[in-house]
From Swiss-Prot:
InterPro entries: P_Acid_Pase_2/haloperoxi_sf, P_Acid_Pase_2/haloperoxidase, PA_PP_rel. The modification Phosphoserine is found at residues 320, 351, 426, 505, 641. The gene is Plppr3. This is Phospholipid phosphatase-related protein type 3. It comes from Mus musculus. One of its GO terms (biological process) is phospholipid metabolic process. The modification Phosphothreonine is found at residue 374. It is found in: Membrane. The chain crosses the membrane at residues 18-38, 70-90, 131-151, 205-225, 231-251, 261-281. Glycans are attached at residues 167, 316. Keywords: Glycoprotein, Membrane, Phosphoprotein, Transmembrane, Transmembrane helix. It holds the Pfam family PAP2. It is a multi-pass membrane protein.
Amino acid sequence: MLAMKEKNKTPKDSMTLLPCFYFVELPIVASSIVSLYFLELTDLFKPAKVGFQCYDRALSMPYVETNEELIPLLMLLSLAFAAPAASIMVGEGMVYCLQSRLWGRGPGGVEGSINAGGCNFNSFLRRTVRFVGVHVFGLCATALVTDVIQLATGYHTPFFLTVCKPNYTLLGTSCESNPYITQDICSGHDTHAILSARKTFPSQHATLSAFAAVYVSMYFNAVISDTTKLLKPILVFAFAIAAGVCGLTQITQYRSHPVDVYAGFLIGAGIAAYLACHAVGNFQAPPAEKVPTPAPAKDALRALTQRGHESMYQQNKSVSTDELGPPGRLEGVPRPVAREKTSLGSLKRASVDVDLLAPRSPMGKEGMVTFSNTLPRVSTPSLDDPARRHMTIHVPLDASRSRQLIGEWKQKSLEGRGLGLPDEASPVHLRAPAEQVAEEEEEEEEEEEEEEEEEEEEGPVPPSLYPTVQARPGLGPRVILPPRPGPQPLVHIPEEGVQAGAGLSPKSSSSSVRAKWLSVAEKGGGPVAVAPSQPRVANPPRLLQVIAMSKAAGGPKAETASSSSASSDSSQYRSPSDRDSASIVTIDAHAPHHPVVHLSAGSTPWEWKAKVVEGEGSYELGDLARGFRSSCKQPGMGPGSPVSDVDQEEPRFGAVATVNLATGEGLPPPGASEGALGAGSRESTLRRQVGGLAEREVEAEAESYYRRMQARRYQD
């Protein structure tokens, strides 16, 4: 059954097995055998001649004939080759029969068959040829090394003088006067014995026997299993003792000196160890080529389910946040919680929808993972800091900046009115065409989206949605509007001191007002009607200034108007139609310092008043207001005075007029005469038209802004 398993394995194809054996390994072994023949069995190579002492007793030992030796050379070669080779063949046969039991435990495993040259070579044949062939080559190499050293050294054997039979008379001198002889004075007739007497170091018997013993002992240690406790030691000791006996016989029979035998043992053992470790790989099977198996795919659903809710609750804040939330979102100002939907397409489950929530708060019940789309979605409450419910706004009051903004507004108004001037008598026609409003809304929405993306890239957006209101005991609330980077808010500033003709005061100031307006009318060319094809340019210095500032900023236009007129918990979530239409904030744009908010009694709207410094003039805007100056001081307008006190005073030039553009309160009737003020009345009418158009645009922009805010809040 085990053999069938080995046979059932698909044999490997080798293109280099036979070529290497025939053209590399076999020629090397054959050449070594041929060389050994010339060195051992012929006199082609003669040893070196070394001198000796006269009558040296160490070289005068008896000579034992070759046929009388205990282990002759041919017997040694046959034993050194036959015994190890037979042992290797028997061992390989047993391994082939029991290869699963013996080799299955080894690091190399079991060798399979190989197809080469149309022949199938099983593991028994290949291993036997490999191990025996290396052993034969080792024997030849050891004999060659021994012969080369013997020929190079030429040391004498203990029986050299016995077979040499030196003739000392040929020296011409006595041995006493010249004891060391270097001349060839041998008179013996056995030339072969004399040549063999000059080759003793190292002992050939010792080298060959040591090589065979070490090589086969290493084979036994590698192949025989540890279950047989005594077989391996017996075989190893048997070959080791045989090698020792071969060497010792050379000493006892005076064939070699003891040092020659010891050197032969070392040389033979070294060659055997080298070939066994490097030529045959310590008799182990070569490592099988393992096909890399792909790593098993990780089941995402199983990994998530293993993380139970209890383990998530037990984690501390840092671990939970690091695992589920990216580090970039944990820094800076808190942001609304964002859900990261992980794609789990590999699960192939239609009824499973995994939402990974990434809260910035410590892990709790609100941070658990739900695995069913039938369960309610869990989301963390929005972390609204009370400080985020307020903001500080700075309204720039630079005269040069105001001129620049008004110039841009004039250009836009000219382009908008070039299509056609609506009827002045009907306030309904003050609206711009629906297509133009839609286009402007789309452009503003794109600008707002770009600005929001830039702010998100730059860093956390500061909480700036509402102004900070400070309560002052006895003086009323005060709104502080510090500067902030970003789009300028829209502040509603009413037109300046133009009211109905019946409201003019009979005091001395009214005459100066009438004189100034008449001079303005004369400079403007008198009450000449403007054709519809020629656009008229009105210069309301305050209303258009703030509208131009909001248009140039391109940001949310209705944030300040809603936040400054109501508390921080209502106006953000209401649409413009639901809010109080009478909540209007009035402010003097030419105030030298921050404006002061005056809260009227009851539920009346706030009005922003500013202290007017006497002697401070305003800037000139356009041709119609070129002669305008503001130098009078309004009595009774202190920082803490209520609106009711101011409203009871008679109107003056430069007073603040509250006009509700949404309801139309404060506007003169459509058919009001222009005789009292002339060009000033037309200018007031034109300002109302522009104000109505701006109000419609503000409402449209506010609706789009709150719609986006509401959608974003739903997403969060």
